[in-house]
A protein has these predicted regions:
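Short, polar loop motifs at secondary-structure junctions
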Residues: 8-15, 267-273
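Conserved AAA+ ATPase "SRH/arginine-finger" region at the nucleotide-binding site
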Residues: 26-36
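Interdomain hinge/linker elements that couple catalytic modules in large macromolecular machines
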Residues: 36, 40-216
Length: 296
């Protein structure tokens, strides 16, 4: 027999299944739609050859702009009703966490999560959050953020350091695990598509990789770790231009030099290029193409 068990996180979190169920069991994390699945939902067929055709690329780019904003929550994509995402957040996230962990002051829980959602993809420290919220305890902030991660709503990553102690101490970065929630829940009037692009890239990387960010003299968005070694460095920039090109490229090349890598990846919204700097190969690829090539 096969049993598929579902339920509210207020009742049972995935990490507790092993202690509650006897015998063998497999946990399968069902994530929001990938870009390829989004295209399939739209009835748009894509293959490795077609993504290089001009007429196909125009259509794909149009769909990608929608995916970047709306994310991949299936019910929301089908009915286009923002209330569906609001309800998931209020019922599954806020209420379930409050019940499961017996949070008395739901207002400060909500305040913290609102702050993080409005500052996604940015660096933060627990003390900086303490200064801008009404939460007086760093330990409470840590606990509240861990609750959010356990519901698969968000994820924090560390600055890479060979010292685990420094990883814990240094600033974190916060990502929401579906862009649709950002669009619906963020209080910001102007939407920064650059941050949305970075958040989307993180979610793809987070599915299969251990991810850190790099910060030295310059910064690089993502480091991919496999078997305790840095295997890839990735910078995300919505559009390379005269104002940001030096900063973005130098952050990437500094990380490449630091970890002795010959190649680096710079993901953009639509630009594509390849160039060599100081013997280092930098490949510039649109995120939509990178997402589809990863799945082929």
């Amino acid at each position: 027999f096969k049993f598929f068990i579902t339920g509210s996180s207020a009742t049972l979190l995935s990490k507790e299944l092993g202690t509650k169920l006897t015998g063998r069991h497999v946990d399968i994390v069902v994530r929001p739609f990938s870009f390829l699945e989004f295209l399939e939902l739209k009835g748009f067929e894509v293959n490795k050859e077609s993504i290089y055709k001009t007429e196909t690329k125009v259509e794909i780019k149009k769909y990608f702009e929608e995916y970047l904003i709306k994310g991949g929550m299936p019910e929301y994509l089908i009915y286009n009703d923002t209330e569906l995402l609001t309800r998931v957040y209020e019922d599954t996230i806020i209420k379930d966490i409050a019940v499961r962990y017996k949070v008395d002051n739901v207002a400060i829980l909500r305040q913290l999560y609102s702050y993080l959602i409005n500052n996604f993809a940015n660096r933060f420290s627990y003390n900086s959050i303490k200064r801008v919220t009404n939460i007086k305890s760093v330990n409470t902030i840590k606990k509240f953020i861990s609750y959010l991660e356990e519901t698969y709503f968000a994820k924090t990553i560390n600055k890479f350091d060979y010292s685990y102690k420094k990883q814990i101490i240094n600033d974190k970065k916060f990502y929401v695990l579906d862009n649709g929630f950002i669009e619906v829940l963020s209080k910001k009037v102007a939407k920064d598509h650059g941050w949305l692009l970075e958040n989307l890239v993180f979610n793809c990387l987070n599915n299969n990789h251990e991810v850190f960010y790099y910060s030295g003299k310059k910064e690089c968005d993502f480091l991919i770790v496999k078997n305790k070694e840095i295997k890839q460095v990735i910078q995300v920039c919505y559009e390379l231009n005269a104002e940001n090109r030096e900063r973005e490229v130098e952050g990437l090349t500094e990380a490449m030099k630091k970890f002795k890598l010959k190649k680096g990846l710079l993901l953009t919204n639509s630009q594509e290029d390849e160039f060599i700097i100081e013997g280092k190969i930098i490949k510039v690829i649109p995120v939509w193409k990178w997402l589809l090539e990863e799945k082929q």
